[in-house]
Amino acid sequence: YTLNWQPPYDWQWMFGFLGARAVTGIETVTHDYYERSFACEGHQGIFRVTPDIATHTLTLTLSPGLVPVAQTCLERIERLFDLACNPQHIADTLGDLGAARPGLRLPGAMDAYEQGVRAILGQLVSVAMAAKLTSRVVALCGEPVADCPGYLCFPTPDALAAADPLALKALGMPVKRAESLIHLAQSVIDGTFPLFPPANIEAGMKALQQRPGIGRWT
């Protein structure tokens, strides 16, 4: 599969950003490619994306398990790497303010629930510690990806909701944070957690802050 992007694109910065936050068992980031596990609609596997600077394309390889949900993978990857961005429009808007850093993109996420978990785990700790904590949660609650040795699926809401708060606390987080993770997972199961951007962003952010363990800095 091939996706397109408009130059300039600072892939070194993007891979650096993702690499600093890479979760062991989920993501592998090198100078040349980004690879991770993904589960969707009962399917699971891994994918790898490799940018081609000369042709302004992103080459995507899916493991067999993800082929049935290829279209969903493409849409999520476009969002993760902000491929719909028009850098010229941004440059025209920012002018001199952005002239020194052309090609920056806004890193997205493959999954709103996963990003919610990672946001809660990232509270009041360094980027490196947030990645370590997430890796520990994945090791505790994630299941191996079939036919992809070394990779785990990000814990499902059901798996995280069923986790023992004290077992999560033992990974290196306050028990309140563990309870926040479980509450988030349960709200996804209940259908009360917004998995898509709300029509009113400000109202949506205020609503999220009413949830346990989520504040304005989350």
Describe each model-derived feature in a short phrase.
Residues 1-218:
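HhH-family (HhH-GPD) DNA N-glycosylase catalytic core used in base-excision repair
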